[in-house]
Design a protein with these regions (language model features):
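Conserved donor-binding/catalytic core segment of Leloir-type glycosyltransferases
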Residues: 183, 208, 216-244, 258
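Carbohydrate-associated surface elements
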Residues: 188, 209
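Nucleotide-activated donor-binding/catalytic signature segment of Leloir-type glycosyltransferases, i.e.
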Residues: 267-288, 292
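Acidic donor-binding loop of glycosyltransferase active sites
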Residues: 295-309, 322
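Short glycine-rich donor-binding/catalytic loop of glycosyltransferases
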Residues: 305, 322, 326-333, 347-348
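Conserved acidic donor-binding segment of nucleotide-sugar-dependent glycosyltransferases
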Residues: 338-339, 343-350, 359-364
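A short, well-ordered alpha-helix in the C-terminal region of glycosyltransferases
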Residues: 352, 359, 366-381, 387-393, ...
Length: 417
């Protein structure tokens, strides 16, 4: 090991999500890598970009399902990178769709410890979010996810889901035996993964890092904001139903709803918003405009139907001194203290969300107070310096407590790669 005193040598592995879709995972990877480099550690990225898929040949696209299960290219390229770079630790983030679990075996063969941040539920659920047909579904938790293929849980397609199910089954033992430290981003997410029987001594909970930001002193507008992907699992249909109920309960709504983001519900949201003067849609906006919107809003809405693994936008809002109104389940109940720095509402209940929005309109001073306390929560619980220290502690654990993992591939596929 090169030693933490003189700086660790870290290799970050990540399959990047499409840039057309806002990705909290991409932001976390970038922010952590930058924080490590600023602290004097040597960081190299091993990344594949989903944006490249649209430029592939028809043959390459036809072979993508096989690559989801096992990417020979990633295995070969990472093995070469490990020989040349010789990192102290490899930090694996997302492996779907272009990296695959092949990278775990490459690290095993090079005797380099792996730290894995588990950002979603894909080790158990083909969709990655435990949502099927707009409702929470735990049918595959603790089991092989074959029901995901039956229901076509990924993008509503059995053909698209099948490679994910095969990959999960083929590499489940590898995920259990080739990782030296697992980082879950909330206790709620960790608890749902207990069904995998991961070695408890190697399991850590570490919230995502949010860079320190000076609070912007700007007057608050009569606005509540939604910032994120426009997807059913994120609660967009719930939000639209709740807003209509809020409008129906008041002749003078008093608030506007601003929606920033993109996703599969783009057209549906745009059509709905166009018929409502109180709603504005912005599409994807740059980070500085996101910060400006958060700083001006009276509250940020997080209506997620799925059980969020973390809720990055909640802590970003806290950093801006803005309270959050969030669905009361998953990790969100760990982040928001109702009556102190925000509010929680009954998940999947549009009337409950409408009532919370009406409360913002009726009691702006209360939400100003919540915002001040939200900033205090950010500084006390989500301090980025402490987050970096915790990350380095987990790296050190992985380096000093490596796993051999020998035999994982033989047990799983019957042969060495």
């Amino acid at each position: 090991m090169s030693g933490q005193e003189s700086g660790m040598r870290v290799l970050v592995v990540h399959s990047r999500y499409r840039s057309a879709m806002p990705s909290g995972e991409n932001r976390v990877v970038d922010q952590e890598s930058e924080a490590l480099a600023r602290a004097g550690h040597e960081v190299r990225r091993f990344e594949k970009k989903s944006d490249e898929i649209e430029h592939w040949s028809a043959m390459q696209k036809a072979l993508l399902p096989a690559r989801v299960v096992w990417s020979r290219e990633s295995h070969r390229e990472l093995a070469a990178t490990l020989r040349e770079y010789r990192p102290d630790v490899v930090h694996v983030h997302n492996t779907f769709p272009l990296v695959s679990a092949a990278v775990l075996y490459a690290c095993r063969d090079a005797s380099v410890p792996v730290v894995a941040t588990i950002h979603n539920y894909r080790l158990m659920c083909a969709s990655g979010n435990f949502v099927r047909q707009g409702a929470i579904c735990h049918d595959c938790m603790g089991k092989l996810p074959v029901r995901g293929a039956v229901h076509g849980c990924y993008r509503g397609s059995r053909a698209a889901t099948a490679p994910l199910v095969v990959a999960t089954i083929a590499h489940r033992k590898a995920w259990r035996s080739l990782v030296s430290a697992y980082m879950f981003i909330s206790a709620a997410q960790r608890d749902l993964h207990l069904a995998l029987n991961l070695p408890s001594s190697r399991v850590f909970v570490r919230h995502n890092m949010i860079p320190y930001r000076d609070i912007q002193s700007a007057p608050r507008d009569p606005v509540v904001a939604y910032i994120g992907r426009l997807e059913e699992g994120k609660g967009l249909r719930l939000l639209m139903a709740a807003w209509d109920r809020y409008l129906g309960s008041s002749h003078d709504p008093g608030l506007r709803l601003v929606i920033a983001g993109a996703g599969s519900l783009d057209r549906e949201v745009a059509a709905w918003a166009s018929a409502r003067p109180s709603v504005e849609t912005l599409g994807i906006i740059p980070p500085d405009q996101v910060q400006g919107l958060m700083s001006r809003a009276r509250a940020v809405l997080v209506p997620s139907v799925w059980e969020e693994t973390f809720g990055l936008v909640v802590v970003e809002a806290m950093a801006a001194g803005t309270p959050t109104i969030a669905a009361g389940h998953g990790s969100l109940i760990e982040l928001v203290t109702p009556g102190t720095d925000g509010a929680l509402f009954q998940p999947s209940d549009p009337d409950a969300l409408a009532g919370a929005v009406a409360d913002v309109a009726a009691h702006p001073e209360k939400y100003e107070s919540y915002g001040r306390r939200a900033r205090e929560t950010y500084e006390q619980r989500f301090n980025p310096n402490r987050s970096l220290e915790h990350l380095l502690e987990i790296y050190s654990f992985a380096i000093t407590h490596p796993v051999s993992g020998r035999g994982a591939l033989e047990q799983t596929l019957g042969q060495r790669p």
